[in-house]
Amino acid sequence: MDYAFLGVVTAVLLGSITSLWTASVQATHRLSLDSLWVLVQWYGTMLLGFAMIYMILQANGHHVFTPSPSSAAGNRLSMLEDSLYLSGMTLLSVGYGDVTPVGIGRWIAIAEALLGYIMPAVIVTRTVFDSDRR
């Protein structure tokens, strides 16, 4: 059941990434509050999606990250908190502190950090190219 949910989360993340090319984003043609709001939504979706991936894998026995010392062992709420923290630190490129990725979690963190760098660049690039066309 958890792996089916992992598939759903992955599909939602891929859908969010491909939404970069939807008509509503293409119609903006400039940097605006709408562009900023779209970027915030993408970051929120990525943060929550990757946090769910970390949590599902960790809950199923895959050692994806080292929990914070203050986390209660086996507590799902603490695991969710650590997963959200790890995802936020990775996506926003702030860096790691007490919760760090290990094993396969390192590769997932690389993919997440890459998306964190690419998303704002895509919006700015699309805006510049779209404004040059007009």
Curated annotation (Swiss-Prot):
The protein's name is Protein LctB
Alphabetized InterPro entries for the sequence = K_chnl_dom
Judging by the UniProt lineage, the source's domain of life is Bacteria
> Gene3D superfamilies recorded for this chain?
1.10.287.70
A Pfam short name: Ion_trans_2
Origin species = Geobacillus stearothermophilus
